[in-house]
Amino acid sequence: VEWTDHLVPVDRVIEYVRMVKKGARQPVTFCENYVPYHTKLAPLVAELDFISIHTYPVWEYKHIHDALEYTKENYVGVANKYPEKPVMITEAGWATNSNGRGIDPDNVNEVLQEIYYHDLTRWSEEEGIITFVFEAFDEKWKGSSDELEPEKHWGLFKSDRTPKKVMRPYFRHLVKEKV
């Protein structure tokens, strides 16, 4: 992504992909937001065994009711551009807290995360799209020192490993009853 402080030029990524492919038996890919695959990453695609995209509707100011449709557009846009390559979603998720930095605080909570998770997994299973949900656990060390920094709150579990609303039905034995 363009905002990173350690951006690697595409021609250098191509060199790395070629180097890895010489020594690996596994398929090789490169994980990135969906947008660069429409432009600057086009030369890289020929070197990849499959394409890996990230999609975060909430970072792009999408309401939960538009989120899955937006995710589909991101996926289909890349898949249609490169019909010869399999495409998977290697990061997709919904934050549960925000201080307003990049994400409207009214557009994040555990209920909305649960809706997006179920919509996303239902669609990807129906379509046979390999999808990885970002992320397993909140990472309280990420982002700024502000406790509500959205980078800290993408997990399906809190940083203390207790399940958020979306995971509670699957991990009831981890949730203490409120007295």
Stretch-by-stretch model annotation:
Residues 72, 76, 114-119:
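A short, acidic, amphipathic alpha-helical segment used as a generic capping/interface helix at domain edges
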Residues 104-112, 123-179:
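Aromatic-rich peripheral "rim/lid" segments of glycoside hydrolase catalytic domains that contact
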Residues 1-2, 32-70, 94:
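Aromatic- and acid-rich polysaccharide-binding/catalytic face
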Residues 7-15, 65-70, 104-115:
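Alpha-helix N-cap and loop-to-helix initiation/capping positions
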Residues 16-38, 84-95, 129-141:
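Aromatic-lined carbohydrate-recognition surfaces of secreted/lumenal glycan-active proteins
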Residues 9, 13-25, 75-82, 121, ...:
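Surface-exposed amphipathic alpha-helices with a cationic face
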Residues 35-54, 99-101, 139-151, 155:
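Substrate-binding cleft/loops of secretory-pathway carbohydrate-active enzymes
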Residues 56-101, 129:
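Glycoside hydrolase catalytic-domain groove-lining segments
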